[in-house]
Amino acid sequence: MHYPSGQWTIWCAESRPFETVVSERLKVFIAAGYETVVIGDNMIGFCIAQKKVNAVFVFYQHVTNEHACCQGGGLLVAVLAKELGVACNLYPTDFDSEKAATGDSLCFAGHNITPLGSHSYIPGADRVALSYFKERW
């Protein structure tokens, strides 16, 4: 399938704890003439269910015979897309969330939102079964 600029809008979920990476990724699409919309990661299911998207792309670092190593949150996106009948595709990235330092606090807009004395769980990568994906780009 071909997604020509000027005819498609890209909805991109911010991706804590790496929200600054989204900005870098979208610059390429904006420069190519795509309209882009950044949504909160909790809005993914709503946007898919409301048929605001025609296809979903999940960034991956590498693939084995059984699964793709995707950026954290990729499993949720793949499950939602499959359940709601929207094609989910794999798209390569050189960003390696398995090696990226996540620290032990959860940030939003660059600020720590973890209360003092608490901990957070921040998975860097998801292993997603290949059966969830329609195509690998």
Please provide the spans of the model-predicted regions.
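Conserved phosphate- and dinucleotide-binding cores of soluble alpha/beta proteins
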Residues: 16-137
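Catalytic core of membrane glycerolipid acyltransferases/transacylases, capturing the structured
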Residues: 1-25
